[in-house]
Structure formats: structure tokens, C-alpha cells
């Protein structure tokens, strides 16, 4: 069976793209009455310019049972060669984590999920145990409040986010772990990439949150010019509030893909 890592690399190479479209489906903002049709058109318009999609579970959960049904349909409408990352930031004790892993990997069939490591290794192990799936561990997140805990200096003399990165390296026996690091903290991203040279890094925070694309690509990419997954949600989904929303999303995704590739080229990385 193809692994998440293999699927991600193939999609990125085929589409020459490090773009991940975040599906943060806010029903108060979508320019059509049917969320399913909105998702269908967004995915159809952008799929040739992305390496992955990332549904934000909270935006589906707030719709209740209809939202869960919608999420299931959205996952299935993504082209099978493009990986889907479930963004739930899950974290709980081992038995509960096992239930989450079964729900997200077996029932909903996500290719990867985001994980909150605050409760330690036993809360992460049930996800690692699926070697064909991927997990992205929250490391240094893009929100301003991340400084409250993630920057605290531990007994090792290192900030907590670096301890998380190093633990992720230790746990990565199945080569299926990645990290979440915000573009809003470029120096921290650079430090984490140096410590974890081969891990994929999911990078939110571009655009609306103020992250700089050049630094995200330059500091987040691995030695081959890959490894960075640049997430964009609102800037693509809501590029237009009119009936041309799908066409506008397509152009926004294409533009971001091309901007990223320009930065890669400037740093002597190419897709060939």
C-alpha cells in the first residue's frame, strides 16, 4: 500500500507544487448556499495546483451531523492521488487516542492528521502505529499565543518547541511523522528544520496571519527543496465573494504555487 509520504511526494512532483489548500468551510462566508457544491467547485478548480488538502474539522463539526456527512463527502471528492490531511489537533490518553485514530484513519480514511503532543508519547503512539498514514505534530504554531508555552525554556536549556521537535525525531520509527510550524516564526522554523532535516513540515500562517512566503519556503524546505507544505486557506477559498469564486480560487492557488516555485528557483531548487 502506498504511504502518505509517497503519496505526498508524488502529488507534489506531478503538480510541481508545495501548496496545501486548507478547507476551512465557514458557511457565513461561502458565496453559494450549498457547502458541498462550494467544496466541489473549489477542489475541482484547484486540484492541479496543490500537493494536498487540509479540511479543518472544527468547521465541519459546527454543522452537527450534517457537517460530519459533508466531511465524509468532501474527503471522497478529492482526487485519489492527492493526500488529505485531517486538521483536528487531536490529543488525549492512549485509549481515547486509539479511538480517534480508528475514526480518522479507518472510518474517514484521512491520509494524515494533525496531533497535539501535550499529553506525551502514549497519546501519539496510536497514530504512529499506522505506518501507511501520516501525522503532523504541533511544534511551533502560528498563533501569537503559542509563545505562552511553546517558548518556555525547559530543564534541557532548550525551548519546549525544540524538545517537541527532538521527541518527534525519536518517535519517527515508521518515517510517518511531520511537524506543524507557523510561517509567522521564521527563525524558529529555521532552527527546527536544521534539527529535523528530513521531516515534512506543514506551514500555516501565510498571508492573513502575516507569515512571509519567502522565509517559509527558504527555511522550511529540506535539502532537496521539498519537505515544506505551505498551507493557504482563506486567501484561496474566499478569493472572491461572487459567482466567480471557483475561478478566483483557481487563480489564487496557481499564483501561490508559482510564487513558491520562484523562491525555490532563486535558491537553486527546481522540479526537474
Spans of features found by a protein language model:
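Conserved N-terminal beta1-alpha1 strand-loop-helix module at the mouth
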Residues: 1-81, 156, 244-261, 265
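Acidic (Asp/Glu)-rich catalytic clusters
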Residues: 12-14, 43-49, 73-80, 126-131, ...
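Short, well-ordered coil/turn segments that N-cap beta-strands
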Residues: 15-19, 49-51, 80-82, 111, ...
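Conserved, mostly hydrophobic/aromatic
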Residues: 21, 53, 87, 113, ...
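Conserved anion-binding
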Residues: 26-27, 92-180, 198
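Active-site-adjacent beta->alpha loops and helix N-cap segments on the catalytic face
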Residues: 62-77, 93-97, 117-132, 184-194, ...
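A C-terminal functional module that forms or caps the active site or interfaces directly
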Residues: 183-231, 235-236
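C-terminal helical cap(s) of enzyme catalytic domains, especially alpha/beta-barrels
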Residues: 215-227, 238-271
Amino acid at each position: 500500500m502506498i504511504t502518505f509520504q509517497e503519496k505526498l511526494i508524488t502529488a507534489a512532483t506531478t503538480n510541481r507544487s508545495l501548496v496545501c489548500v486548507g478547507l476551512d468551510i465557514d458557511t457565513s462566508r461561502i458565496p453559494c448556499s450549498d457547502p458541498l457544491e462550494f467544496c466541489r467547485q473549489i477542489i475541482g478548480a484547484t486540484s492541479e495546483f496543490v500537493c494536498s488538502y487540509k479540511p479543518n474539522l472544527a468547521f465541519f463539526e459546527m454543522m452537527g451531523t450534517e457537517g460530519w456527512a459533508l466531511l465524509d463527502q468532501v474527503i471522497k471528492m478529492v482526487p485519489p492521488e492527492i493526500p488529505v490531511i485531517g486538521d483536528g489537533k487531536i490529543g488525549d490518553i492512549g485509549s481515547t487516542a486509539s479511538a480517534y485514530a480508528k475514526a480518522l484513519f479507518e472510518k474517514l480514511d484521512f491520509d494524515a492528521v494533525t496531533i497535539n503532543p501535550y499529553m506525551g508519547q502514549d497519546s501519539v503512539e496510536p497514530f504512529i502505529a499506522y505506518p501507511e498514514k501520516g501525522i503532523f505534530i504541533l511544534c511551533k504554531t502560528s498563533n501569537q499565543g503559542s509563545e505562552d508555552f511553546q517558548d518556555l525554556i525547559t530543564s534541557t536549556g532548550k525551548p519546549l518547541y525544540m524538545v517537541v521537535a527532538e521527541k518527534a525525531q525519536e518517535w519517527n520509527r515508521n518515517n510517518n511523522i511531520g511537524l506543524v510550524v507557523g510561517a509567522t516564526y521564521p527563525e524558529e522554523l529555521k532552527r527546527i528544520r536544521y534539527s529535523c532535516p528530513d521531516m515534512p513540515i506543514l506551514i500555516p500562517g501565510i498571508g492573513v496571519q502575516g507569515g512571509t512566503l519567502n522565509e517559509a519556503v527558504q527555511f522550511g524546505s529540506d535539502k532537496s527543496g521539498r519537505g515544506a507544505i505551505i498551507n493557504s486557506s482563506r486567501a484561496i477559498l474566499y478569493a472572491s465573494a461572487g459567482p466567480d469564486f471557483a475561478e478566483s480560487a483557481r487563480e489564487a492557488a496557481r499564483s501561490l504555487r508559482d510564487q513558491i516555485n520562484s523562491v525555490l528557483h532563486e535558491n537553486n531548487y527546481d522540479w526537474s
